[in-house]
A protein has these predicted regions:
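Flexible phosphate-sensing "switch/lid" loops adjacent to ATP/NTP-binding sites
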Residues: 1-374
Length: 374
């Protein structure tokens, strides 16, 4: 299938070639600093959902389809999404580029490595871990950090169960007690959340410097800035902070940038990407993780309160018949079967999410994501 060159996609938003860093023919990073003076004038549409099921309800697919629909109506529309993590891509969840005709492309490249942002977050996170242990080693028992209090683990962008709990420091030359630690997935890193909340490199460095890594022997907190890790970590993230521009199958511009999980962080793409999209397009569709009680709630409570992104002008609450049946008590294996009583019972869940959105006073619609078996 032929896609538009990313230069053509950028031109749709008024982004000049000099402010693009090309990653092949269909991907590019945008120098967001060149557009910092443009205020976000567009209307933001947030896509959320009822309580998710193991099958997923299709928020990403709905968001992509809505942005394409706005483009077909002649509106200047843009899409903002999170980057896929390799862990879920190779796990039961799969990729995060939509499906069918509602898809962002180039699909394989977005799902696998993309522009290297997640690897940069991995490097920055693990640099801090290495500097923590280095400080403990060279300071000795009387140093700044009490090795028994270190809270900072390591990360990698993969589901590797064997590394969730490990013991480090068993080398006889390591000047500290061996301790139990582990590896988290990169998308769950505090660095990922920080990258997606930062407004620029200066703000990024300040936020990275505030990361708590452990305590002194007398209980005082020790931060990343105390071991001089903030500058080096920011240097590793200097390219990752720029949003990634791609497109949907129908050629609608899409910024895919950052990937914090909603259960342990705020669960939406970077503030920089959303703000840039709102300054260049009339309508911006974004997606928040999980349901209205988690991703949407955090969008209002965290993202909007930064002052960098306005509150949504409208919301879409995604539902499915299989989710209604699931929350009506039907087992996963029996979801394909017709069960009107279970659908009716499942409306209690949907009704609660409707109440959640009403609290925020934002106009919304309920979207029924239809499947062939419905």
């Amino acid at each position: 299938m032929n896609f538009k060159p990313v230069l053509e996609v950028a031109n749709q938003l008024g982004i000049s070639e000099e402010n693009l860093e090309l990653y092949g023919r269909y991907k590019a990073k945008v120098n967001f600093q060149a557009y910092r003076e443009k205020s976000p004038q567009g209307k933001l549409i947030m896509v959320t959902a009822m309580t998710p099921t193991p099958a997923g309800e299709g928020k990403t697919t709905t968001a992509i389809g809505l942005s394409d629909a706005l483009s077909r109506l002649g509106q200047k529309a843009c899409l903002t999404l999170r980057e896929p993590s390799l862990g879920p891509v190779f796990g039961i969840k799969g990729g995060a580029t939509g499906g069918g005709k509602a898809m962002v492309v180039p699909r394989e490249e977005i799902n696998l490595h993309f522009t290297g942002d997640i690897h940069a977050v991995t490097a920055a996170h693990n640099l801090l871990a290495a500097m923590v242990d280095n400080r403990i080693h060279f300071d000795g028992p009387a140093g700044l950090l009490d090795g028994r209090t270190v809270t900072w683990k390591r990360v990698l962008d993969m589901n590797d169960r064997a590394l969730r709990q490990v013991i480090i420091g068993t080398d006889e030359t390591f000047q500290s007690l061996a301790r139990e630690t582990g590896f988290d997935i990169t998308a769950a890193s505090e660095v990922m959340a920080i990258l997606c909340l930062a407004s620029d490199l200066k703000d990024l460095k300040a936020r990275v410097g505030n990361i708590l890594v452990g305590f002194t022997a007398d209980g005082r907190p020790v931060y990343a800035r105390d071991i001089k890790a903030d500058g080096a970590m920011t240097a590793l993230l200097k390219d990752a902070i720029n949003p990634n521009l791609v497109q949907t199958l129908e050629g609608t511009p899409a910024f895919i940038h950052g990937g914090p999980f909603a259960n342990i962080a705020h669960g939406t793409n970077s503030i920089i990407a959303t703000r840039l999209a709102l300054s260049l397009a009339d309508y911006v569709v974004t997606e928040t993780g999980f349901a209205s009680d988690l991703g949407a709630e955090k969008f209002f409570d965290i993202v909007v309160r930064t002052g960098q992104v306005p509150a949504p002008a409208a919301c879409v609450l995604v539902s499915t018949l299989r989710a209604l049946k699931y929350h009506g008590g039907v087992k996963i294996a029996e979801l394909p079967n017709v069960n009107l009583k279970a659908v009716e019972a499942g409306f209690d869940n949907l009704r609660k999410h409707i109440e959640n959105l009403k609290i925020f006073g934002v106009p919304f619609v309920v979207a029924l994501n239809l499947f062939p078996a419905d």
